[in-house]
């Protein structure tokens, strides 16, 4: 049926049909004639929808329905537009005077009974200004008795949500009551009264005794538990490779970053950086490199660095077989290039005597000029047996006695470069640069040295073919007092707690063993990290190829222990507790390569694979976001 075809209602009344048929002339019906049916009957339309009677009227949609806000709409800006457009009228539209609005920052983060944002100010819209102007012409100034009497009955209904006091404040700020060029709203951020200002860990101390939080102990709390109050501060990712060493000067005004260097086309500047905390600047120091066969610079891995005790110089060692001295402005002051192989480790005495461990098996002692940084003298530390066996000097530390460095130097040897797990631990006299003794340890490759900052002991870890071992040594007798055996095949870090009682061993298995030195036979705790973020070949022994835990730090002057593993997570522990885990401090995108506190515990630097460096600081106001350092001109040296 076409659109022009008339619609004929069908009748089923037989009497009506009989009366009509009696009046029509008799004709022969040709049922095969389609035109006959088209003229007398409506052709069936399958798409025709008959209107059926509705037994119940439809219900209207509620007028309070709220349209769904698109996901790309800024809800905060949308609310401000609604508040100032006059189309959205809350129960209260308060007005703050201009003088008070200049100090609204003092109201932020206020404590309220709920966690909903509070509306504290809404500017008068142009429509409201015109209403006030008309009322002023009729009833006089806003701050008058006649206006006040008329407000509740004649004016308030036209200004929903406005109090008479709001109009008074607005007249003081704007005597003409004329519309302002820009108008908006102020919403106060709030938080609940029961929000945790301190972690549950500290809350437990508070419940145990409030004297812990008395005024004279607040400084001790911040020193010992500062990791809970550290906030994101700076992010940096311009290094040449993975950052493997970080140093702070004693005043915590400067810092330095040392990174690995890549081979071939990926080798680039950025292996050594020095930064300033106050000016928030950082610069690259270009000097640790070698010239290849075609005369191009190939930058070397920075293996270790440290600042002088007098805050004047930075000492750096690298795989270019050199030790270099820099001033605080990044100027090169001295070079020691006598070593014939990689520099592995640096150590500094309280008198700024520098000790160096080299891959060729030698140790070196360097004295520098206190004013210019020039290297004045050098002496070799030689253990003949280690040289004969081809050991590498991989560790070096000045011995400590009750918080002061002594004239004794400890060197740890290994033979990893020959795929051998052999080595030893030796003692030297720095005053005469002479060998004193070999420690009574097994001939095992030593992997870490940790000198207690204020006690009379230190720990050294070693690897055997099947397991690991940690030795606890006394600096008064220079003998092994205790040893702890672990199933770890490769130990990255061994440490002693600030109390001198707890000993830890962190390895490539992404675990840390903890012992009580009073009961050395059995581990006290086992601290575990999660699944590694490093990529390994199928079938590889993960413990042999994974980086494991590369960060094992005690909170300075405190009891907290902080670890960072190849799962990219930095964890905080209190090893005095039965359940030592406290919280995850942060999570990086890849495996942790280094982490360390500043001496005053006000800074913490965490580095991961790929070169990312995150710095956390006390007292910053970055809104939990990382800022950036300003990079200044490189020091180009030849």
UniProtKB/Swiss-Prot annotation:
WD repeats lie at residues 297-336, 486-525, 544-583, 587-626. One of its GO terms (biological process) is meiotic telomere clustering. SMART domains: WD40. Pfam families: WD40 (PF00400). Keywords: Chromatin regulator, Chromosome, Cytoplasm, Nucleus, Repeat, Transcription, Transcription regulation, WD repeat. Gene3D superfamilies: YVTN repeat-like/Quinoprotein amine dehydrogenase (2.130.10.10). It comes from the Eukaryota. It is found in: Cytoplasm; Nucleus; Chromosome. GO terms for cellular component: chromatin; CLRC complex; cytosol; mating-type region heterochromatin; nucleus; pericentric heterochromatin; subtelomeric heterochromatin. InterPro entries: G-protein_beta_WD-40_rep (IPR020472), WD40/YVTN_repeat-like_dom_sf (IPR015943), WD40_repeat_CS (IPR019775), WD40_repeat_dom_sf (IPR036322), WD40_rpt (IPR001680), WDR55_POC1 (IPR050505). Component of the Clr4 methyltransferase complex (ClrC) which contributes to the establishment of heterochromatin by specifically methylating histone H3 to form H3K9me. ClrC preferentially ubiquitylates H3K14 and ClrC-mediated H3 ubiquitination promotes clr4 methyltransferase activity for the methylation of H3K9. H3K9me represents a specific tag for epigenetic transcriptional repression by recruiting swi6/HP1 to methylated histones which leads to transcriptional silencing within centromeric heterochromatin, telomeric regions and at the silent mating-type loci. Component of the Clr4 methyltransferase complex (ClrC) composed of at least clr4, rik1, pcu4, rbx1, raf1 and raf2. The cullin pcu4, rik1, raf1, raf2 and the ring-box protein rbx1 are components of an E3 ubiquitin ligase, whose activity is essential for heterochromatin assembly. Interacts with nup189. This is Rik1-associated factor 1. It comes from Schizosaccharomyces pombe (strain 972 / ATCC 24843).
